C-alpha cells in the first residue's frame, strides 16, 4: 500500500502512531489489528523508517536506511512471520538473542511480527517475558487479524490500534498475480 493510501484509508490508526512519535511518547509495543491488506505491515514499516531515518523530514523514503527497510534488509529491523502456519518458540528465542546485542550504531531496534496470532503458546510466553522488560531503544509491531488468539497478557502490554477494513471498491489491483492471490 502506498503511503498516501495508508494515510487516506487508515487515518485514525496512522494518527495514533505518528502522534506518539511526534510527542516523544512512543510505547515499546504496538498491536496492529486488521485483516490482511488493511495496511498494518506497511504502517509498521513506515514507523520503522520514522524511527531510524536520520533526515529532518523523516522518513525521507530515499536514504539507504529507508530503502533497506522497504526491501526488508535493514539490520536493525527484524521480521518474524509464520513458518508454515505457525510462529514457533525458537523464532522468538532467536529474536531475543538478536536484540540482546546492542545496535551497532545506536539506532533503535525494531521487530515486526506478522500474523502474531499464529504464535504457539510457547512462543507467546517467550515473547511475553521480552515484552515485560522493555529496552527503551526496542520497538515491537505485532500484526494480527485475530487478536483474541493472543494471550491476554500480551494484548495488555501493547498499545492496541485497529485497522479498519478497506472497502473492496477502493482496492486497486495493478498486477494479474495479485488478483490471483486475492481470489
Range-by-range predicted roles:
Residues 118-119, 133, 149, 160:
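Residues immediately C-terminal
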Residues 74, 92, 124, 147, ...:
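ATP/adenylate-binding site constellation spanning eukaryotic-like Ser/Thr protein kinases
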Amino acid at each position: 500500500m502506498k503511503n498516501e493510501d495508508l494515510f487516506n484509508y487508515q487515518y485514525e490508526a496512522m494518527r495514533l502512531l505518528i502522534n506518539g512519535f511526534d510527542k516523544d511518547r512512543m510505547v515499546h509495543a504496538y498491536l496492529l489489528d486488521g485483516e490482511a491488506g488493511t495496511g498494518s505491515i506497511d504502517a509498521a514499516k513506515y514507523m520503522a523508517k520514522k524511527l531510524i531515518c536520520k533526515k529532518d523530514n523523516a522518513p525521507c523514503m530515499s536514504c539507504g536506511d529507508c530503502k533497506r527497510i522497504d526491501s526488508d534488509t535493514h539490520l536493525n529491523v527484524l521480521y518474524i512471520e509464520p513458518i508454515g502456519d505457525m510462529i514457533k518458540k525458537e523464532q522468538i528465542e532467536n529474536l531475543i538473542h538478536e536484540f540482546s546485542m546492542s545496535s551497532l550504531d545506536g539506532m533503535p531496534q525494531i521487530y515486526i511480527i506478522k500474523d502474531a496470532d499464529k504464535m504457539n503458546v510457547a512462543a507467546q510466553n517467550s515473547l511475553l517475558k521480552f515484552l515485560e522488560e522493555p529496552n527503551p531503544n526496542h520497538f515491537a509491531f505485532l500484526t494480527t487479524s485475530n487478536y483474541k488468539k493472543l494471550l491476554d497478557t500480551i494484548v495488555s502490554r501493547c498499545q492496541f490500534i485497529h485497522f479498519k477494513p478497506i472497502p473492496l471498491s477502493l482496492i486497486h489491483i495493478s498486477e494479474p498475480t495479485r488478483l490471483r492471490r486475492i481470489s
